[in-house]
């Protein structure tokens, strides 16, 4: 028989629950609030068959465009050929979670605001742009208790 091309084909490991995360779904999953414009990650929960997105969208990040009682509409851009296609996927809340992709940026914004406020109080200017890491500073290596060792490759020998 030819193999199946079903909607859940080849998802044996993709839709697995995590280690020590089997059983009842946590109540916190249902208590999270989603608003239009929130950035969410789609992570399929194999224990809930209702409102499950297609396997392509598992692991994708999108923006919430619609909120209902038990599900959210997520806007995702899919690469098709040489273009991005806008896809609107309706997913139950068991299969989405808030994304942490902007967390680093938001933390940096808060830190920059604190630096700016402190500098303004002192009457100084502050550099808020990120700078690339400079090269290591020049230094001398002492050979007093650190004798140089010459390394040679080991000759290849066939053993039968």
Curated annotation (Swiss-Prot):
One of its GO terms (molecular function) is structural constituent of ribosome. One of its GO terms (cellular component) is cytosolic large ribosomal subunit. InterPro entries: Ribosomal_eL21 (IPR001147), Ribosomal_eL21_CS (IPR018259), Ribosomal_eL21_sf (IPR036948), Translation_prot_SH3-like_sf (IPR008991). Its main location: cytoplasm. Gene3D superfamilies: 6.10.250.3260, Ribosomal protein L21. The keyword Ribosomal protein applies. It is found in: Cytoplasm. Transmembrane segments: none annotated. Keywords: Cytoplasm, Ribonucleoprotein, Ribosomal protein. Residues 114-140 are annotated as: Disordered. GO terms for biological process: cytoplasmic translation. PROSITE patterns: RIBOSOMAL_L21E (PS01171). It holds the Pfam family Ribosomal_L21e. Component of the large ribosomal subunit (LSU). Mature yeast ribosomes consist of a small (40S) and a large (60S) subunit. The 40S small subunit contains 1 molecule of ribosomal RNA (18S rRNA) and at least 33 different proteins. The large 60S subunit contains 3 rRNA molecules (25S, 5.8S and 5S rRNA) and at least 46 different proteins. Belongs to the eukaryotic ribosomal protein eL21 family. There are 2 genes for eL21 in S.pombe. Component of the ribosome, a large ribonucleoprotein complex responsible for the synthesis of proteins in the cell. The small ribosomal subunit (SSU) binds messenger RNAs (mRNAs) and translates the encoded message by selecting cognate aminoacyl-transfer RNA (tRNA) molecules. The large subunit (LSU) contains the ribosomal catalytic site termed the peptidyl transferase center (PTC), which catalyzes the formation of peptide bonds, thereby polymerizing the amino acids delivered by tRNAs into a polypeptide chain. This is Large ribosomal subunit protein eL21B. The gene is rpl2102.
